[in-house]
């Protein structure tokens, strides 16, 4: 299952957790606020991962996260991939900033 940025934004903020599976080096250059950076193979065993929330899995472009979300769903998690990955999230944030700047002028 994939969720668009718009779908994620519509979710109750207490109902999901973003899991960023990108490398620490990639995350050092930017990350989604509140996301947990956990490598794909460690999600099941990481104590920070809530079992009572939807997991929104994020990779760079939204490809690897699809496989990880499917695997986690098979293991009993409520998981989905962020469509387009971090790059899509970043582009959306840049668009929002542009709109805000236009509204200020």
Locate the predicted segments by residue.
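Rhodanese-like catalytic fold shared by cysteine-dependent sulfurtransferases
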Residues: 1-17, 24-54, 63-105
């Amino acid at each position: 299952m994939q969720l668009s940025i718009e779908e994620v934004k519509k979710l109750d903020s207490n109902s999901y957790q973003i899991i960023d599976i990108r490398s620490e080096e990639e995350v050092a250059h930017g990350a989604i606020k509140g996301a947990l950076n956990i490598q794909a193979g460690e999600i099941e065993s990481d104590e920070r991962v809530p079992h009572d929330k939807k997991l929104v899995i994020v990779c760079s472009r939204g490809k690897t996260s699809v496989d990880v979300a499917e695997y986690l769903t098979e293991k009993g998690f409520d998981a989905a991939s962020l469509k387009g990955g971090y790059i899509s999230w970043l582009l959306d944030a840049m668009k929002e900033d542009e709109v805000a700047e236009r509204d200020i002028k």
